UniProtKB/Swiss-Prot annotation:
This is Leucine--tRNA ligase. It is an enzyme of class 6 (ligase). The keyword Aminoacyl-tRNA synthetase applies. Signal peptide: none annotated. One of its GO terms (molecular function) is leucine-tRNA ligase activity. It comes from the Bacteria. Pfam families: Anticodon_1 (PF08264), tRNA-synt_1 (PF00133), tRNA-synt_1_2 (PF13603), tRNA-synt_1g (PF09334). A motif ('HIGH' region) lies at residues 44-54. Its main location: cytoplasm. InterPro entries: aa-tRNA-synth_I_CS, aa-tRNA-synth_Ia, Leu-tRNA-ligase, Leu_tRNA-synth_edit, M/V/L/I-tRNA-synth_anticd-bd, Methionyl/Leucyl_tRNA_Synth, Rossmann-like_a/b/a_fold, tRNAsynth_Ia_anticodon-bd. Keywords: Aminoacyl-tRNA synthetase, ATP-binding, Cytoplasm, Ligase, Nucleotide-binding, Protein biosynthesis. Transmembrane segments: none annotated. The keyword Aminoacyl-tRNA synthetase applies.
Length: 862
């Protein structure tokens, strides 16, 4: 407990956490008489240890939850575990422990690490995605998606992670490498299950404009990822063949500048030619070893292979263009074929120069000498890709680019050589993963019937527990019995689908499961989801902008259309927090060192604790195990307590920016907690003023403090509403400074001191709840502060009755005086003439005159 001379952090925080739990303060129930507020942080993967990023993320969400609860909202603030995934399989291989055992042990450990943070979480709603009670509903959703045409199977080129032996979605390939393993990704062709996210591309894009409580950067990232473009599908007839090469282009206005066509290494035409051309087959194999990211493809050297085929230009059948297989053409975008216009696309220019292809200028800036411009451009290695007017383009000449595009598309359609189309960069979501520790896909493969859905009365399809990890790849593939079943349609021997779902499948709907997590018959209790959804405030990392966040938006629409939900968007508000950073340290051999291995001096230099050898201090970077610049949250909570950790996370910098972890910062937060407690022990607190109105007769300092309290309440309220948590902490510190400065001998000081401290505790409660509860209790207030309404303020108290007036001598600034608003002229003169700087200018003489501009300026003329 807190004593009269020392604040016992451990005992006090444990006491209030027990009180909150026993009082059921954070247990949420539907109550249609109250406005709801659903706060959710992106749920964690159970790695076995929380990190400082968790501390920041959950502190931010908890401040919102506590604040909204105090404002009278019915708050839902749940917790769960994103529990499937490859790390558990890796642990099984490395440690010889079953993934289920490893995962459940980690959940138990992390739950006990989270609880000392004092989070206002409704733990009764806890879910884990690896439990059959959760994923059985996911399997049912998939079958419903299958019926609705939202799920399908096809053979496709996939991103294969050779280390994790699984397929990655495009979004999971970062700079050509697997997002988890970091291994260079390979291209393979496999039969995969897909979700038809492209059906919602237009809607997903259009609705981004309505997400006005999302960060602009996330909305822009999703806009670019969906990638809507308007262009044309153009058919170039193949010379000597009764077929055409179909090309998608966003620049049909540049068709007169075409000098070649290029197809993807994965294009069917490339495969056909490669079957009899070993050199092309070798080139295609080389392309398959390239990185898969667009950035990597764009920056790589442009290479091509001349197939020997020619195509006819749609505007002139006599005009023939060569067809190349090129390493920069993506099969996944458009039609997997392009026409090259080197003069107006830098990639095409690089390719043309490499292979000696012609460069024809067909767009020039308005108002220039078109012939001279074209001559210079055609001799240059730099493409002109800006807007202008069409030149050397027949019927398009003189038209601005926008008009030339429309006219070109119309002409293509008239010729029967193509049509205008809208294209999206977004591709359907491949959800098949070749691993054990995931949700089984509820499909049975029959040689006669093909893929057959598992009957709903046989759900869930459970993962077998008797698996081994002594062979590469998916243990389900070589399980002796699990995959062998009878076909549900014909009864003949068949095989289970051994792929499991991408773990983003689970995280795309978990937020809705929290609304009624114990319903065994349905994924969602409709009354509950209709009440709680959408999530009002979601908190998490920006790295999920085009992964989890986009998939969740798609899933919500798909579930709506399948009758599960009544909303279209999952998250009304989104906040993306910054990262936690720390200095990095290396020894003389360049090996990374952890902060607890070094001794850092006041001048910023550091030495190794073990032998005193010099340590190189590097820049502050994101905390990571690889660079050993992490700080253990459990050690911080043990040493300083939850409130100090929370306060430092909130006060150091704006929550959307990266913050640097420093020992001095956490120590400063800890000292402030102690200061608050000592203020609550002050003898000037009026013991008889509990709940009583303030006395009418107050001294000037006490009256000023009352006004300061009202301003603090208004300011902190606004700061918390707008996620300016660091500003809210600063206002709280200013208020405590003002309280400490109150003269206890003034009239009404004891009552005002109590009023101000009680209000400070109420303002602090969302941020540092334990010390706030202890102060509230010590000050004699009944009930839990966690259940106490948010303080209000008097708008009249926000109007300043004091003004700061500039004082000049002969027009030059010499100081300021603080006076009551609309002070009498003689009072203003007297205050100005009493300033030491003015007295020095007067040098004992009387002023010639004093000019007073009320509430603004006093000018002393000497």
């Amino acid at each position: 407990m807190a004593s009269e001379d020392r604040y016992n952090v451990k005992e006090t925080e444990a006491k209030w956490q027990t009180a909150w739990a026993e009082g059921g303060c954070f247990t949420a129930r539907e109550d249609r008489t109250r406005p709801k507020y659903y706060v959710l942080e992106m749920f964690p993967y159970p790695s076995g240890r929380i990190h400082m990023g968790h501390v920041r993320n959950y502190t931010l969400g908890d401040v919102v939850a506590r604040f909204k609860r105090a404002q009278g909202f019915n708050v839902l603030h749940p917790m769960g575990w994103d529990a499937f995934g490859l790390p558990a399989e890796n642990a099984a291989i490395q440690r010889g422990v079953h993934p289920a055992t490893w995962t459940r042990q980690n959940i138990a450990i992390m739950r006990e690490q989270f609880k000392p943070m004092g989070l206002s979480i409704d733990w009764s709603r806890e879910v884990s995605t690896c439990e059959p009670a959760y994923y059985r509903h996911e399997q049912k959703m998939f079958l419903d998606f299958l019926k609705a045409g939202l799920a399908y199977r096809r053979e496709s080129w996939v991103n294969w992670d050779p280390v994790e032996h699984t397929v990655l979605a495009n979004e999971q390939v970062i700079d050509g490498k697997g997002w988890r393993s970091g291994a260079p990704v390979e291209r393979r062709k496999l039969s995969q299950w897909f979700l038809r996210i492209t059906r919602y591309a237009e809607d997903l894009l259009a609705a981004i404009g309505d997400l006005d409580r999302w960060p602009d950067k996330v909305r822009l990232m999703q806009t670019n990822w969906i990638g809507r473009s308007e262009g044309a599908r153009v058919r170039f007839g193949l010379v000597g063949r009764d077929q055409a090469l179909e090309v998608y282009t966003t620049r049909p206005d540049t068709l007169f500048g075409a000098s070649f066509c290029a197809i993807s290494a994965n294009h069917p035409l490339a495969a056909e030619i490669a079957a009899t051309n070993p050199d092309l087959a070798a080139f295609i194999a080389e392309c398959g070893r390239m990185g898969t990211s667009e950035v990597e493809i764009e920056t790589a050297e442009k290479k091509g292979f001349d197939t020997g085929l020619k195509v006819r230009h749609p505007f002139d059948p006599a005009w023939e263009l060569p067809v190349y297989v090129a390493n920069f053409v993506l099969m996944e975008y458009g039609t997997g074929a392009i026409f090259g216009c080197p003069a107006h696309d830098q990639r095409d220019m690089d390719f043309a120069r490499k292979y000696g292809l012609p460069v024809r200028a067909v767009v020039a800036p308005a108002g220039v000498d078109a012939e001279a411009f074209a001559k210079d451009l055609e001799a240059s290695d730099t493409a002109f890709s800006e807007d202008g007017v069409a030149i050397a383009s027949g019927f398009l000449d003189g038209l601005p680019v926008s008009e030339a595009k429309a006219r070109a598309i119309a002409h293509i359609a008239e010729l029967g050589a193509g049509e205008g189309v809208v294209q999206f960069r977004l591709r359907d979501w491949g959800v098949s993963r070749q691993r054990y520790w995931g949700c089984p896909i509820p499909i049975i493969h029959c040689d006669d019937c093909g893929p057959v859905p598992v009957p709903e009365d046989q759900l869930p399809v459970l993962l077998p527990e008797d698996v081994t990890f002594d062979k590469p790849g998916n243990p389900l593939d070589h399980h002796p019995t699990w995959k062998h079943v009878a076909c549900p349609q014909c009864g003949k021997p068949a095989r289970r689908e051994t792929d499991t779902f991408d773990t983003f499948f689970e995280s795309s709907w978990y937020f809705a499961r929290f609304c009624a997590p114990h319903d065994t018959d349905r994924a969602f209790e409709r009354e509950a989801v209709d009440y709680w959804l959408p999530v009002d405030q979601y908190v998490g990392g920006v790295e999920h902008a085009v992964l989890h966040l986009l998939y969740s938006r798609f899933f919500t629409r798909a579930l709506r259309d399948c009758g599960y939900l009544g909303v279209s968007e999952p998250f009304t508000g989104l906040f993306t927090q910054g990262m936690i950073c720390h200095e990095t340290y290396r020894d003389t051999d360049g090996a990374w060192l952890s902060p607890d291995q070094i001794d850092k001096a006041a001048d910023g230099t550091a030495t190794l604790l073990s032998d005193g050898s010099p340590v190189s201090v590097g820049r502050s970077e994101k905390m990571s195990k690889s660079k050993m610049n992490t700080v253990d949250p459990t050690a911080i909570l043990e040493s300083y307590g939850a409130d100090a950790a929370r306060l430092f996370m909130l006060s150091d910098s704006p929550p959307d920016r990266d913050m640097d972890w420093t020992d001095s910062g956490i120590e400063g937060a800890w000292r402030y907690i102690g200061r608050l407690w000592r203020m609550a022990l002050q003898p000037q607190i009026d013991p008889g003023a509990v709940g009583a109105p303030l006395p009418a007769d107050l001294g000037p300092g006490a009256a000023a403090l009352v006004r300061h309290v009202h301003k603090a309440v208004a300011g902190v309220t606004d700061d918390l509403e707008k996620f300016r948590f660091n500003a809210a902490v600063a206002r709280l510190r200013e208020l405590t400074n003002a309280i400490a400065a109150l003269d206890g001998k003034e009239a009404g000081a004891g009552a005002v001191y109590r009023f101000a401290l009680e209000t400070a505790a109420r303002l602090a409660a969302p941020m540092i709840p334990h010390i706030a509860e202890e102060m509230w209790s010590h000050l004699g207030r009944d009930g839990l502060l966690a259940e106490t309404p948010w303080p209000t303020w008097d708008p009249l108290m926000l109007i300043d009755d004091q003004v700061t007036i500039a004082v000049q001598v002969n027009g030059k600034m010499r100081g300021t005086v603080d006076l009551p608003k609309d002070a009498k002229r003689e009072d203003a003169e007297a205050a100005a003439l009493a300033l030491p700087t003015v007295l020095a200018q007067l040098a004992g003489a009387a002023p010639r005159k004093v000019i007073v501009v009320p509430n603004r300026i006093i000018n002393v003329v000497v």
